[in-house]
């Protein structure tokens, strides 16, 4: 059995949590398989800034954002499911923006094959393993995570958990979040990417035309 991170791990500042989640592995039990993905991209959100759902106020649908750190907040984005974890402070959370399919003794090649069946490409063909979770809705589709099942729930070590498997990014890229409308704090650098996996995330922050110090920053391990 995998070992789940304790709930108190998530009860920390959203930016700290967003950085600390990089390299951790999400595991979801599907039948007798543990589907798994290594987190490579996260975004932090605060109640006090305009880019967050919580800034729009408390509703029953958003209640997970206002619960203790470690609650699951899921919603629909562009027709697909999205996964967030509540952080310290009411209304603060981390969006799991993308991940990289993970295999080990717990989550083997059969689990990877199931993820590929869950998330074919637009033509119905098998999606390459490195692109299976390259976006927030692709991630949830590959792992089989659904809003009605997991929204406002706690982790269940028998079904859904986040595990520390000893993977720590050597460098982290800090940059602006994606899809934030103009005038809603789109300038805030609350997006964090494992530099070693930058080309596999939602949008590569190191792509041509991006300038270090203007468009992104490098955070060395421990910063």
From Swiss-Prot:
It is an enzyme of class 3 (hydrolase). Its EC number is 3.2.2.-. One of its GO terms (biological process) is base-excision repair. It comes from the Bacteria. InterPro entries: Formyl_transferase-like_C_sf (IPR011034), MPG (IPR003180), MPG_sf (IPR036995). GO terms for molecular function: alkylbase DNA N-glycosylase activity; DNA binding. NCBIfam families: PRK00802.1-5 (NF002005). Belongs to the DNA glycosylase MPG family. This is Putative 3-methyladenine DNA glycosylase. It comes from Pseudomonas syringae pv. syringae (strain B728a).
């Amino acid at each position: 059995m995998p070992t789940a991170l304790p709930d108190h791990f998530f009860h920390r500042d959203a930016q700290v949590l967003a950085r600390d989640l990089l390299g951790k592995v999400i595991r979801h039990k599907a039948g007798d398989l543990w589907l798994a993905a290594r987190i490579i991209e996260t975004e932090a959100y605060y109640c006090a800034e305009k880019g967050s759902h919580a800034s729009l106020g408390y509703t029953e649908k958003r209640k997970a954002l206002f619960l203790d750190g470690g609650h699951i907040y899921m919603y629909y984005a562009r027709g697909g499911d999205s996964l967030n974890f509540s952080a310290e402070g009411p209304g603060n959370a981390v969006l799991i923006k993308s991940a990289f399919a993970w295999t080990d003794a717990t989550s083997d090649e059969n689990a990877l094959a199931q993820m590929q069946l869950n998330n074919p490409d637009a033509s119905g063909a098998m999606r390459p393993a490195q692109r299976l979770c390259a976006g927030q809705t692709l991630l949830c589709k590959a792992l089989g995570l659904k809003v009605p099942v997991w929204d406002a729930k706690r982790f269940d070590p028998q079904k859904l958990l986040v595990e520390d498997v000893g993977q720590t990014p050597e460098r982290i890229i800090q940059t602006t979040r994606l899809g934030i409308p103009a005038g809603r704090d789109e300038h805030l650098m609350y997006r964090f990417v494992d530099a070693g996996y930058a080309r596999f995330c939602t949008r590569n922050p190191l792509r041509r035309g991006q300038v270090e110090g203007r468009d992104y920053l490098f955070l060395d391990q421990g910063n």
